[in-house]
Amino acid sequence: METALSTPVFARRNVAYACATLCCLLWGSSYPAIKSGYELFQIATDDIPSKVVFAGYRFLFAGALLLLFALAQRKPIARLTPTQFGQLTILGLTQTTIQYTFFYIGLAYTTGVNGSIMNATGTFFSVLLAHFIYHNDKLSYNKTLGCILGFAGVMLVNFHSGIRDFRFVWNGDGFVVLAAFILSAATLYGKRISQTVDPTVMTGWQLGIGGLALVAGGYATGGTLEVHSLTAVAVLGYLTLLSSVAFALWSALLKVNRVSMIAPFNFVIPVAGTVLSAIFLGENILEIKYAIALVLVCSGIWWVNK
């Protein structure tokens, strides 16, 4: 159970804004970190099973870390009904296993800059799904305009050498977009579960279950993960920490705040992903199309939540 003070703390606007910004900064930093991890663990671009193993260990460790944290807070992590455990299993397999399988594969076939912006489509998928799921969250003029602006930005980033040369790599950009859609649907499902299961416990179980499935699936299909340096371990450790902290915080924020208040902070993700990819991976962000695309994506998210 949560303490009496946890809900009002996360419900305070300044705390909620700070935590939401931190979550999105962490998620944005995952783009260059994942690509660096591939290099440090010497995972080839076409070695999909090893990428799945890499993802699995990240989330398995993150889930275990969160459950240990919940135990330290004396939260009951095993007092789950069969129905609740089934819900957490479904959440873990969708939000972690399936979603990140597409995400990791997709990121290997696109740039960190493209990946961070393509993944921003998740905000617009959330708006569209909410229209069909919640009676009090229908599409409006602002939301429709926001979706159009956001997808315009996503399309722009894939234009190369002029409008006639449109480039969209299905197993790269397409998989990142598909991962964003799956995450949006799973997040709405997780919001419902968090009303009966503590957000930290829920996130720990779903990351652990999803991560274990990724590890098993990766090894079963011929994947491996060999440690070649302490730097590689440090990168995996960073990805583990950002997953546990960001997902747990985000779940706690969504439980006690309106989605429309927290969602606008998603604009930090493509911005952070683009800037950090340029800094750590040496990718080019000096093309004017990237600046315009980021403005369109951020404007779209702002209009959706206006």
Give names to the regions the model predicted.
Residues 57, 96, 100, 114-121, ...:
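Helix-helix packing/entry segments at the starts of transmembrane helices
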Residues 37, 54, 106, 132-139, ...:
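Hydrophobic/aromatic residues within transmembrane alpha-helices
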Residues 40-97, 125-129, 182-186, 203-221:
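Transmembrane alpha-helices of multi-pass small-molecule transport proteins
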